[in-house]
Every structure is written in structure tokens, then in C-alpha cells.
Amino acid sequence: MLSKSCRAISQRSFSQSSLVFANYGKPQNPPIDTEIKLKIQPIVRTGETIEVKRARLLYQSRKRGILESDLLLSRFADKYLKTMTMEELDEYDKLLDEADWDIYYWATKNYKITPLPDKWKDSKILKEIQKIANNEEKVIMRMPELNLEPESNTK
């Protein structure tokens, strides 16, 4: 007959090896969400004149980093930025604070990939960008010239 200490050792070894065997091949750490979600707060600009704001928004519309967004936003800026009110410029500025791919999917109405937030559902600016994305005129899109000067009729 086995002594008490020998039985305790064999039970401990058996129960420990059972746990190791039961977990064999399973991941030992919980799964890690590999997508990092980081929202950088936009810079609060105070005392910016309307001309400076238009120039900054024109640059930010064109230099996004994603060609598709650059094309849509720079064409929008070229067409509308010169005549927008300060309130419209503020709304457009807030739209440009969103992620590039989100803006692109909203502009192309691809809401399955990136759902449209409630705050942009009634946006006239986004609707105009969506019209540009539809390209109803069937023109070949290219980057417009960087120019904030009004077009002159004198030649």
C-alpha cells in the first residue's frame, strides 16, 4: 500500500498534467484586438481670418495622403471654398477632422464599410461631395490648381 505522502504526490502530478493536457494546443493568452483606435483631437484655432481659413482648408483638402480623398475633396474645395460662409467653412473643417477612409466611404455612399454617423446625415457639404463622387458629368478627374483667387473675366 502507498503511503499518504506518495498518494498526495501522485494525485498532484496527475491533476496538474491533466490541466496541461486539456489546454494543449489552445492559445494561452486571450486574443488581442490588433486594430488600434486612436482619435487625435483637432487643433483648436482661434482668431483665424476667413482668408487664412480658406487657404488652410484648401491645403488640407488636397494633401490628405489618400489619392481618392485628395481628388474628391480638392475638387469640392476648388468649386465651393471661395463662396462658403464662415459657418460652412467651420462645418467643412470638422468634416476634414474625420479619418480619410471614412470621408471617402461616406462620399461614395459605401455605408457597409463605414456607417455614416448621425452628425453628417443632414450635411449639405457632404451631399455636395457625394455629387462630385458620382461624377454625373463623366469627366476625368484630376487635381485642380491650387488657387484661391477668384477667376477674372479679363484676358
Curated annotation (Swiss-Prot):
Keyword entries, A-Z: Chaperone, Mitochondrion
Coiled-coil region: none
Major localization listed first in the record, in broad terms: mitochondrion
GO biological processes: mitochondrial electron transport, succinate to ubiquinone; mitochondrial respiratory chain complex II assembly; protein-FAD linkage; tricarboxylic acid cycle
Cellular localisation: Mitochondrion matrix
GO cellular component, one term: mitochondrial matrix
Other notes: This protein may be expected to contain an N-terminal transit peptide but none has been predicted.
Primary role: Plays an essential role in the assembly of succinate dehydrogenase (SDH), an enzyme complex (also referred to as respiratory complex II) that is a component of both the tricarboxylic acid (TCA) cycle and the mitochondrial electron transport chain, and which couples the oxidation of succinate to fumarate with the reduction of ubiquinone (coenzyme Q) to ubiquinol. Required for flavinylation (covalent attachment of FAD) of the flavoprotein subunit of the SDH catalytic dimer.
Family designation: Belongs to the SDHAF2 family.
PANTHER family named in the record: PROTEIN EMI5 HOMOLOG, MITOCHONDRIAL, SUCCINATE DEHYDROGENASE ASSEMBLY FACTOR 2, MITOCHONDRIAL
Quaternary structure, from the entry: Interacts with the flavoprotein subunit within the SDH catalytic dimer.
Protein name: Succinate dehydrogenase assembly factor 2, mitochondrial
Species name: Candida dubliniensis (strain CD36 / ATCC MYA-646 / CBS 7987 / NCPF 3949 / NRRL Y-17841) (Yeast)
Lineage: Eukaryota, Fungi, Dikarya, Ascomycota, Saccharomycotina
